[in-house]
């Protein structure tokens, strides 16, 4: 990749974007995945690498803001309605359920029409999912935290601040 003139020491989040743009340019995903089958295999591996860190990001919110009243759940890799793949991690808690709003969600998805997979929240847009090792998954923890936190912020707008147990203490 002699034409890739990016600085050698990019921060992790910019390395992900760099890889994303190169994959789009070169028509591949990862090292050499071109076929949908190979890309889906890499997606399943990425979900496996990401699982611990997605749970951690949600559990941090559960422990600190939801006062450990929430439940983290994960689906594993599933076939989506459009024929692609999806895997979700959710954090539900009593106040959220009472108000019938979405849980905090981290979703890895690979739409059937996409070149490669992405991450998103229930209310937050897309981020490239270019994870091929446990170290790369760990480096995504700040992104997962940002998606989960932004999702919670947006859920407060859908309801109000009273869905956050830690805010209601000593009130």
Regions found by a protein language model. Give the residues of each.
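Intrinsically disordered, low-complexity regulatory segments enriched in Ser/Thr/Pro
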Residues: 1-12, 16-19, 23, 86-143
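Charge-rich, low-complexity N-terminal segments
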Residues: 1-53
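Short, flexible helical or helix-coil boundary motifs
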Residues: 17, 21-24, 28, 57, ...
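Amphipathic alpha-helical segments
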Residues: 45-72
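Well-ordered alpha/beta subsegment
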Residues: 142-149, 153
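Extended, compositionally biased alpha-helical segments that mediate assembly or anchoring
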Residues: 159-171
